[in-house]
From Swiss-Prot:
Entry's family note: Belongs to the bacterial AtpI family.
Biological processes per GO annotation: proton transmembrane transport
Keywords: Cell membrane, CF(0), Hydrogen ion transport, Ion transport, Membrane, Transmembrane, Transmembrane helix, Transport
Protein name: ATP synthase protein I
């Protein structure tokens, strides 16, 4: 279980660093409004990642399958963005997907750079 917590902390850290880099880049190249929309989506993605980690942690002990209530978080955010004129759907959605970029970075790092056999096991 210690390995799970270590992986979770690493994924959250990478997500936060990636969020900061992208937020500053979007602010420089676009506008503060779009950057804040991205940041809102990225923060929602971190909350989603935390909810997913809690579900995975309970898997096997208390539950037999993962819950699907996490998706309500994204749906509520997209509905809010579509109703409120200050929010833009695309930057929020792309911000939400930042945690997916973190997973890609982690998989590439483990598969190609690290000598760790975590993902190479059949």
């Amino acid at each position: 279980m210690q390995e799970f917590y270590q992986l979770y902390q690493e994924l959250v850290l990478i997500t936060l660093v990636l969020t900061g880099v992208v937020f500053i880049s979007v602010w420089i190249f676009y506008s503060l409004n779009i950057a804040l929309n991205y940041l809102l989506g990225a923060c929602t993605g971190v909350v989603y990642l935390r909810m997913l980690a809690k579900d995975v942690e309970r898997l096997g002990r208390e539950k037999q399958s993962l819950s699907k209530t996490r998706l309500a978080l994204l749906m509520a955010l997209i509905l809010l963005a579509s109703r409120w004129n200050q929010l833009q759907i695309m930057p929020i959605f792309l911000g939400f997907l930042t945690y997916k970029a973190t997973l890609i970075i982690y998989v590439v790092r483990v598969a190609f750079i690290s000598d760790s056999p975590k993902l190479r096991q059949p």
